[in-house]
Amino acid sequence: MAAQAAPELAKLDLNKNTGSAEASTVPASGSDKDDAENEGDSDDDRDDEQTGGSAEVNAEKKKKKKRPKKKKKTAKVQSVPPRIPLTTLFPNNSFPEGEIVEYLNENSYRTTNEEKRHLDRMNNDFLAEYRQAAEIHRQVRQYAQKELIKPGATLTDIAEGIEDGVRHLTGHLGLEEGDSLVAGMGFPTGLNINHCAAHYSPNAGNKVVLQHGDVMKVDFGVHVNGRIVDSAFTVAFDPVFDPLLTAVKEATNTGIKEAGIDVRMSDIGAAIQETMESYELELNGTSYPIKAIRNLNGHTIGQYEIHGGVNGKSVPIVKGGDQTKMEEGETYAIETFGSTGKGYVRDDMETSHYAKVPSAPSVPLRLTSAKNLYSLINKNFGTLPFCRRYLDRLGQEKYLLGLNNLVSSGLVDAYPPLCDVKGSYTAQFEHTILLRPNVKEVISRGDDY
């Protein structure tokens, strides 16, 4: 889930041609034995037999020379809507790699250093899982951009269309106990409109319809064996918002460019802010400076832990004093948020996102509904974020009392939507990057952004 709020905000309330080869090996119909039995016939008969035999032999030779037609290799393409598991399209598990970026300056030796290359080769399973998740994200978002995200579409239809695609492409629909932990949604689909920047997903009964004048952030995650690809983009139908989208996209690319082993977080944040705040948006004759949302950050990603767990790190998008360095082997979500408002978000609107607290202490639960729900969360989501619709999908009813009890007991965190002032517009772009020993890989990079 894409956005990690700054610490002070976190303290606020609260997915035959068959037979051709066999035909060429069928035994001949004529034989030497037949020719011997017919040897005593008349000359005319013998001539006829010889002629017939010769015809059969010639026919047989033609049969033997005739090779079966080779099947034309047709490129396997994804269906619309996406329903073909990715392992069917890539049967050898050779999934496309992301954008490969060589390290620069003092880290340039890593690209050719044999020891670093050896360490990188040891990560084959890790890379295959991440690349599979990334390709699923690319294929599903391509479908969403072309077929789902249109003025007049409901947020529920968009969210469920994305999530159904992810689940089918992973091959894990998540309806059986534990299936969602093998592969599926890395976190719920965020569909954040206008002043809302993050963590909004439609709950059951939501009737919100996307409008032509809306600016919507689409943020969803895909995981394979807990390797979460976290990537987001912004859609606006009115070109008047292009400067806002360009500013945030360029700021994210700046963050990706600056990121690397031994780079200080403060340097990345300063570069991001400088890029983003060089833009402005003119709306109805008024110019609005585009501000980086200072209390939202990028973050490390851990296995099954979207914000990196207890030792997770934050990547600021404004200049500051954080001297923490990035390290070899880490995975980061580099995301930036821009706003025409105050550049600061607060909790607002109805909560949809939740996640089990990693390594939560043992707490006695008095409510039976809370106990049962906590068991279901452990078995189906673990520490992966989930939303109310996911509980509905598993057949849960009247669970809000138990869910709120888990939140108040400190076993589950609630993530309310994060919003700037009403009337403002916000945008987001995000990629997942891997700091491999010898290169940096922008694992979620695609042709779209």
From Swiss-Prot:
Which residues are recorded as binding substrate? H199, H307
What is the main EC category here?
hydrolase
**Basic residues composition bias: residue spans:** 61-75
Residues annotated as binding a divalent metal cation 2 are: D230, H299, E335, E430
Protein's cellular compartments: Cytoplasm
Tell me the segments the record calls region Disordered.
Answer: 1-91
**Catalytic activity annotation:** Release of N-terminal amino acids, preferentially methionine, from peptides and arylamides
Q: Which cofactor does it need?
A: Co(2+); Zn(2+); Mn(2+); Fe(2+)
Write down the CDD domains for this protein, in alphabetical order: MetAP2
Top-level lineage group: Eukaryota
Q: Which GO terms describe its cellular component?
A: cytoplasm
Here the disulfide bonds are none
An example GO BP is: proteolysis
Residue spans crossing the bilayer: none
Q: Where does a divalent metal cation 1 bind?
A: D219, D230, E430
Renumbered to this chain, the Acidic residues biased-composition regions fall at 34-50
**What would be one Pfam family of this protein?**
Peptidase_M24
Which UniProt keywords are present, listed alphabetically?
Aminopeptidase, Cytoplasm, Hydrolase, Metal-binding, Protease
User: Gene3D superfamilies attached here?
Assistant: Creatinase/methionine aminopeptidase superfamily (3.90.230.10), Winged helix-like DNA-binding domain superfamily/Winged helix DNA-binding domain (1.10.10.10)
Q: Which family does it belong to?
A: Belongs to the peptidase M24A family. Methionine aminopeptidase eukaryotic type 2 subfamily.
Supply the PANTHER family for this chain: METHIONINE AMINOPEPTIDASE 2 (PTHR45777:SF2)
**NCBIfam families attached here?**
met_pdase_II
Name recorded for this polypeptide: Methionine aminopeptidase 2-2
